[in-house]
Regions:
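N-terminal helical capping/dimerization or prosegment-like subdomains
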Residues: 1-87, 92-95, 346-348, 449-451
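Generic non-transmembrane alpha-helical segments
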Residues: 9, 18, 22-29, 52-60, ...
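Buried hydrophobic packing segments
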Residues: 53, 125-135, 164, 228, ...
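A generic structural motif
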Residues: 72-74, 226, 258-265, 346-349, ...
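Active-site metal-coordination/substrate-binding segment of hydrolases
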Residues: 82-150, 156, 443-454
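Acidic/histidine-rich catalytic neighborhood of metal-dependent amide-processing enzymes
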Residues: 121-200, 233, 237, 241, ...
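Acidic-enriched catalytic cores of C-N bond-cleaving enzymes acting on peptides and small amides
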Residues: 185-188, 192-212, 217-267, 271-332, ...
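An extended, acidic, His-containing surface patch that forms the Zn2+-binding/catalytic region
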Residues: 268, 272-342, 348, 352-364, ...
Length: 468
């Protein structure tokens, strides 16, 4: 029921314009987590985005509530809540390499809307709000309530949603449009240890004095830079040319006195799909291990890292933890953070682990590999999340997807964690269509406007079927 009305509602050109304007209003706000301020647990940016999201909901006539700038809740009616839809308004940092537009200046090109958050997850917020508006405008009677939850800390640990559920109960049904269609019912676990090594300060040259790589644990680093004491650009350039051909990264050399500054540029990607990017940290280490450096502590540590994380190894083979199972696929690994100075280093990788992974075949193996080179590693594992495919929620969502997409519905397993990872019975549902790559977390992030409109149709039908 209601398919013809829903199609007609969203096929109106005015609806498309409304969607673009709503997403753009949210994207213009830089909602990256920063230091907490009074009443703003994740800083002013996420709080400002939440205020705008709640304003959009109120403009559509919905009751909205701000949970202390952690989460915003938007209710369809005052009945018992049957469905929670979880979206988030925070974004990862802008990074570098944008070419179509600036990160917070949304622009439409060839049916795609570009800007940080268009795909993850401000576009889906707008699609859900429009779906709720459609159900209301079409006069569909709902016996139960649907509540949209707009979070502000999904990218940095989901403290927001934990705060909300410490005060409010779970709903019988929960989905999050923070993934892709059809339905994601299995999310891999994760292992993200911090590893360290120290050594005595030394003055021999050439040596690496400092190195900085990456800006967020769940982003494959697009850039890394270092300072090499006692080496000229002329001496380093042949090594750079060879390493660039081997790795696919670019190196920029700048001399400042006796120091050589090296900037390595790769390609950013989400840490759960490292094969879609080019890791600047491992690309820089690859070069440094080829240079004629002095035999000092930093040189030995870099050679150890090169052995443990060779450039292009996104499966954890060298570390000894590569594994896979039929249900959830292979382990993936992104070496995403590294800081090094004259007396030590600290790094962290983000691995998404299959159901078959455990502390014995993953954590213990990695710690032993680190120990072999004199590193210490600390950090536990997060369990996978799984909701059976035959639950009423999943079967209903798949039916709605098939109804409006014309494609076969099926369940998927992913490496990325979504808001529902710790919510019993929850699944990720949209907004990306199969095969679409919006370069989430990378430069020129974008969403397909037509796909977002289709997603809004699907969500409207799902709200009706689950709450009607």
């Amino acid at each position: 029921m209601y398919q013809d009305q829903i199609n007609a509602y969203f096929d109106d050109p005015a609806r498309r314009q409304q969607l673009v304007e709503m997403i753009s209003r949210l994207v213009r706000i830089r909602s990256v987590r920063e230091e907490a301020q009074p009443g703003m647990p994740f800083g002013p940016g996420p709080a400002a985005a939440l205020a705008e999201g709640l304003k959009l909901a109120e403009e559509l006539g919905f009751a909205a509530k701000n949970y202390d700038n952690y989460v915003g809740a938007v209710d369809f009616n005052d009945q018992e809540t049957q469905l929670h839809i979880l979206c988030h308004l925070d974004v990862v940092g802008e990074g570098t390499g944008w070419t179509v537009t600036e990160p917070y200046e949304p622009v439409e090109v060839d049916g795609m809307l570009y800007g940080r958050g268009t795909d993850d997850d401000k576009g889906p917020v707008a699609a859900v709000l429009l779906a709720m508006q459609a159900v209301k405008d079409l006069g569909v009677p709902l016996k139960k309530n649907v509540r949209l939850l707009m979070g502000t800390d999904e990218e940095s640990g989901s403290e927001d949603i934990a705060y909300y559920y410490s005060k409010e109960p779970y709903a019988p049904c929960t989905f999050s449009p923070d993934g892709e269609f059809p339905v994601i019912n299995l999310e891999k676990g994760s292992y993200k240890p911090v590893f360290t090594k120290t050594w005595a300060a030394e003055s021999a040259t050439p040596r690496v004095k400092e190195l900085h790589g990456g800006f967020r644990i769940n982003v494959l680093p697009p850039e890394a830079q270092c300072v090499v004491a006692g080496l000229s650009a002329q001496a380093a350039r042949p090594y750079c040319d060879k390493a660039a051909a081997e790795t696919g990264v670019a190196y920029e050399l700048t001399e400042r006195g006796d120091d050589l500054h090296i900037l390595c540029k790769g390609k950013g990607a989400h840490a759960s799909t490292p094969e879609e990017g080019v890791n600047a940290i491992t690309g820089l280490i690859h070069l440094l291990c080829a240079l004629p450096l002095a035999k000092v502590g930093s040189t030995a540590a870099l050679h150890a890292l090169n052995a443990l994380f060779p450039h292009g190894d996104s499966a954890g083979k060298a570390l000894g933890i590569a594994q896979a199972d039929q249900m959830s696929g292979p382990l993936t690994l992104a070496f995403s953070l590294l800081e090094l100075n004259d007396t030590g280093l600290s790094g962290q990788f983000d691995s998404r682990v299959p159901v078959c992974a455990n502390e014995d075949n993953c954590k213990a193996v990695a710690e032993a590999a680190f120990a072999k080179f004199g590193f210490a590693a600390e950090g536990g594992m997060q369990a996978p999340h799984y909701t059976p495919a035959d639950t009423p929620l999943v079967t209903t969502l798949l039916k709605c997807y098939e109804q409006y997409s014309g494609r076969k519905g099926e369940c998927l397993a992913i490496g990325g964690g979504t808001y529902v990872h710790d919510i019993p019975g929850g699944v990720a549902f949209g907004c990306a269509m199969p095969g679409f790559n919006g370069n989430m977390h990378g430069p020129d992030e974008h969403t397909c406007i037509a796909d977002q409109l289709t997603a809004a149709k699907i969500f409207a039908q799902a709200i009706i079927d689950l709450c009607g």
